[in-house]
């Protein structure tokens, strides 16, 4: 209601004409509520104000609290807030009732809609930026064959999984109308299954990243023993039977609304959410061990203590998004507080939509091998296309015996 929450109520009171019959019934109801109260001494009698709020019999000198009206003059109000009225020392009610806390639910719904639309914009913007960054990173890994080691192949597959997930996200957003949801046609269920499959592959490729780092840093095994097919089985293979089992469960127990959401008491979604949470927990253990080893190695070095901690913090900040620990935030319940829910909605929307962008930055754009390979290619391209290179090549060509040079013509003319 803005800065004057009583303004609408006051305007309504000026135009209000209560039906005598309904007012009488309200008085009787209010009086019946007060019968149970046993008050001695000076008191205010039960009363119904012009808004319809019942103020029960109360002792003199007391501030009485009553819920805000649920519905008044065509406007719904939040009944979790309260109105206040004082029972004066002389046993009469104060003329003024404090309804300053009573807020229109209409305004709250408008605020919720605004926050929802902003969150939708953040989601679309984040997924667009992420998809562009992921495609650029994918092309770089495709073109730069000189850096194709197992570590970068894992990065490449993770980026591919994120591309497919982002692409199916756009398919879901653009095709899943309310009518399609209700019809529950076969293709929309396949789209949902594909989206969930690529979502799970993101987690398992992050698990592959964690396995590789843990093997290389903590277990100190030679990474030459690791094979590409092992990680392909983990990243692309393991999620497939998980999603098949989930789809069968949905088909038999929750076959509605294109398999989005879930009915109360049906827990088929945990078939794929459970393994995702499990690999997150394992990655958390990997992260703890990796940071512990990094701290030990840094402490054993000759650098100062400040530099040691700085490197440890940098390593931690890099490893957090790499191992997917940020997804832990998506399982947090923000509670009923409005501020917490708004912050959670924005924070969740930002993290989920920009996750692909962060992966591209950490795995590709900040990758020293990728940057070095790009720099070499750029220098080769400059050498090939620069004027200096063309002149140098022309000067290096030997003069043919049958070709007369400009210098020899000049000398013969002088003679």
UniProtKB/Swiss-Prot annotation:
The keyword Glycoprotein appears for this protein: yes
Keyword terms: Cell membrane, Disulfide bond, Endosome, G-protein coupled receptor, Glycoprotein, Membrane, Phosphoprotein, Receptor, Signal, Transducer, Transmembrane, Transmembrane helix
Tissue note: Predominantly expressed in the cerebellum, pituitary, cerebral cortex and olfactory lobe.
Residues exposed to the Extracellular side: 24-111, 175-189, 254-269, 332-338
Annotated region (Important for antagonist binding), positions in chain: 280-290
SMART domains: HormR
Main location class: membrane
Effect after changing residue 355 to A: Increases antagonist binding
Glycosylation sites: 38, 45, 78, 90, 98
Any single biological process term in GO: corticotropin secretion
Residue intervals passing through the bilayer: 112-142, 150-174, 190-218, 226-253, 270-295, 307-331, 339-368
Cysteines joined through disulfide linkages: 30-54, 44-87, 68-102, 188-258
Known outcome of mutating residue 283 to A: Nearly abolishes antagonist binding
SUPFAM superfamilies the UniProt entry points to: Family A G protein-coupled receptor-like (SSF81321), Hormone receptor domain (SSF111418)
Protein name listed in UniProt: Corticotropin-releasing factor receptor 1
Location of the protein in the cell: Cell membrane; Endosome
Domain of life: Eukaryota
Domain notes: The transmembrane domain is composed of seven transmembrane helices that are arranged in V-shape. Transmembrane helix 7 assumes a sharply kinked structure. The antagonist CP-376395 binds at an allosteric site, far from the presumed binding site for the physiological peptide ligand.
Resulting phenotype, residue 280 to A: Nearly abolishes antagonist binding
Signal peptide: 1-23
């Amino acid at each position: 209601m803005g800065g004057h929450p009583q303004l609408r109520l006051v305007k309504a009171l000026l135009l209000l004409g209560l039906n005598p019959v309904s007012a009488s019934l309200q008085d009787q109801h209010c009086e019946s509520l007060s019968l149970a109260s046993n008050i001695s001494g000076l008191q205010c009698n039960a009363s119904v104000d012009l808004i319809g709020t019942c103020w029960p019999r109360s002792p003199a000198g007391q501030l009485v609290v009553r819920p805000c009206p649920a519905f008044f003059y065509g406007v719904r109000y939040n009944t979790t807030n309260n109105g206040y009225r004082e029972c004066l020392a002389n046993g009469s009610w104060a003329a003024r009732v404090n309804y300053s806390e009573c807020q229109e639910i209409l305004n709250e719904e408008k605020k919720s809609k605004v926050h929802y639309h902003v969150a939708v914009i953040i989601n679309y913007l984040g997924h667009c930026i992420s998809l562009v960054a992921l495609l650029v990173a994918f092309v770089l890994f495709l073109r730069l064959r000189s850096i194709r080691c197992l570590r970068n192949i894992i990065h490449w597959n993770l980026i591919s999984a994120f591309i497919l997930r982002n692409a199916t996200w756009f398919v879901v957003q653009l095709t899943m109308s309310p009518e399609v949801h209700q019809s529950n046609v076969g293709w929309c269920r396949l789209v949902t299954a594909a989206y969930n499959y690529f979502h799970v592959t993101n987690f398992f490729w992050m698990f592959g990243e964690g396995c590789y780092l843990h093997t290389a840093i903590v277990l100190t095994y030679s990474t030459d023993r690791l094979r590409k097919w092992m990680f392909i089985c983990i990243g692309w293979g393991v999620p497939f039977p998980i999603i098949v089992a989930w789809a069968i469960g949905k088909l038999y127990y929750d076959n509605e609304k294109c398999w989005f959401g879930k009915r109360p008491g049906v827990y088929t979604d945990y078939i794929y959410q459970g393994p995702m949470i499990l690999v997150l927990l394992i990655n958390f253990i990997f992260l703890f061990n990796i940071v512990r080893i990094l701290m030990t190695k840094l402490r054993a070095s000759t650098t100062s203590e400040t530099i040691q901690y700085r490197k440890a913090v940098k390593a931690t900040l890099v490893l957090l998004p790499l191992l997917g620990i940020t997804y832990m935030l998506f399982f947090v319940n923000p509670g009923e507080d409005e501020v917490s829910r708004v912050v959670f909605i924005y924070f969740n929307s930002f993290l989920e939509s920009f996750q692909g962008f962060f992966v591209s930055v950490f795995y590709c754009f900040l990758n020293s091998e990728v940057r070095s390979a790009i720099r070499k290619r750029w220098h080769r391209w400059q050498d090939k296309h620069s004027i200096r290179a063309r002149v140098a090549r022309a000067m290096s060509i030997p003069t043919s015996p049958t070709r007369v040079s400009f210098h020899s013509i000049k000398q013969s003319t002088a003679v």
